[in-house]
């Protein structure tokens, strides 16, 4: 049966016991929420550790019985028959514990800024961007998260040329972070009279929502411009300069916001997006430096990388990073089966982490 770092397990169990004891004392409501959240994360792994140790003890007893010359043949045969299943159970529990002990991404519990932009393919790309947004909106709803569109530029035939939304909920970044990249669709557009399959694309960016303490943005580094909000075809939709464009001069990152009639609200939303983009750009730079000699095929997060193809004629979705194909496109694009892709990507990423840990890197 696989071995585990017993000292780490003891620390984990001690932390769990300390939290349970502290819950019995007089604590603030805020502290109570923090503790119950941590306990809910620890409970499954603590149970796995206790079960693993019980299996380990049972295997030791069986091995002693098998090795004992005084054990009769029938009992030895029963013990030898029972041991493989126990060993497999122990290995299964050990793997679960190893995954739980992996270093956590500090951003995993953050809310998310979700940005979807139509790419090549004209109106069809905008329609596809709309499909992707609804897919994530439905998936978020199934997780109990809240989705709020902050900025949207609608396509001529529907969908979106670009949409930015905030996804609020526990573990939003952990679930959605592998969705960044180019999503490609192959289907026959409604406007296609010859029945030909067209290929279009949309780019998805998933950014952990940055807090003010994460990014130091100096006022002198910002160029802030106000203007009248523009409607379809360039018409003015109001007579006040409520639209805001903020440029972060050092990075060249630009955010335009005009969805609210309130300049104050547009400015706050623009700063929130700008903060997340600057923070994400720095994280991307650091991650690129760290992975210069080691490629994580799932977690690269390269926005120019084609990560997934949605083929409507064949009813399939293929994730190119892990070579996984699901023949349930309607369920995936509806958001109901998206979790199957996300779970597979998470498992692959964890396997890569475990391999790195095992290699002593």
Curated annotation (Swiss-Prot):
**What disulfide bonds does the UniProt entry report for this chain?**
none
GO cellular component terms, semicolon-separated: cytoplasm
The principal localisation class reads cytoplasm
One GO MF annotation is:
translation release factor activity, codon specific
Location comes to: Cytoplasm
Q: Where is this region: Disordered?
A: 288-307
Please verify whether the record's keywords include Cytoplasm.
Answer: yes
Q: Which PROSITE patterns match?
A: RF_PROK_I (PS00745)
Its domain of life reads Bacteria
- Alphabetically list the UniProt keywords: Cytoplasm, Methylation, Protein biosynthesis
Sites where N5-methylglutamine occurs are at: 235
> What is the protein's known function?
Peptide chain release factor 1 directs the termination of translation in response to the peptide chain termination codons UAG and UAA.
The text of the family note is: Belongs to the prokaryotic/mitochondrial release factor family.
Q: Which protein, by its recorded name, is this?
A: Peptide chain release factor 1
Species assigned in the record: Nitrobacter hamburgensis (strain DSM 10229 / NCIMB 13809 / X14)
Gene for this chain: prfA
């Amino acid at each position: 049966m696989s071995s585990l770092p017993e000292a780490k397990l003891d620390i984990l169990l001690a932390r769990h016991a300390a939290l349970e004891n502290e819950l019995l004392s007089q604590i603030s409501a805020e502290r109570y929420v923090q503790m119950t959240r941590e306990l809910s994360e620890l409970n499954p792994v603590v149970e796995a550790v206790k079960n693993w140790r019980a299996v380990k003890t049972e295997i030791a007893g069986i091995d002693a019985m098998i090795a004992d010359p005084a054990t009769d043949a029938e009992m030895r045969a029963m013990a030898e028959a029972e041991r493989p299943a126990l060993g497999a159970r122990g290995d299964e529990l050990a793997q679960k514990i190893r995954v739980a002990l992996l270093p956590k991404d500090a951003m995993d519990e953050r809310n998310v800024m979700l940005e979807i932009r139509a790419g090549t393919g004209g109106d069809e790309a905008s329609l596809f961007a709309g499909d992707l947004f609804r897919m994530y909106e439905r998936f978020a709803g199934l997780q109990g998260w809240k989705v709020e569109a902050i900025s949207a530029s609608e396509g001529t035939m529907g969908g979106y040329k670009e949409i930015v939304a905030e996804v609020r909920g526990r573990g939003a970044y952990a679930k959605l972070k592998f969705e960044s990249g180019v999503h490609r669709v192959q289907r026959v557009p409604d406007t296609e009279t010859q029945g030909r399959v067209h290929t279009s694309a949309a780019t998805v960016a998933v950014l952990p929502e940055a807090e003010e303490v994460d990014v130091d943005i100096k006022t002198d580094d910002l160029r802030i411009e106000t203007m009248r909000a523009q409607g379809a075809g360039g018409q003015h939709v109001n007579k006040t300069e409520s639209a805001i464009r903020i440029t972060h001069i050092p990075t060249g990152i630009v955010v335009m916001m005009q969805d609210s009639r309130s300049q104050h609200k547009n400015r706050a939303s623009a700063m929130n997006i700008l903060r997340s983009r600057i923070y994400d750009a720095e994280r991307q730079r650091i991650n690129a430096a760290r992975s210069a000699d080691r490629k994580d095929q799932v977690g690269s997060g390269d926005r120019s990388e084609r990560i997934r193809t949605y083929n409507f004629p064949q009813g399939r979705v293929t994730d190119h990073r892990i070579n996984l194909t699901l023949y349930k496109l309607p369920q995936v694009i509806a958001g109901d089966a998206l979790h199957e892709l996300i779970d597979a990507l998470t498992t692959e990423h964890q396997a890569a982490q475990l391999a790195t840990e095992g290699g002593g890197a």
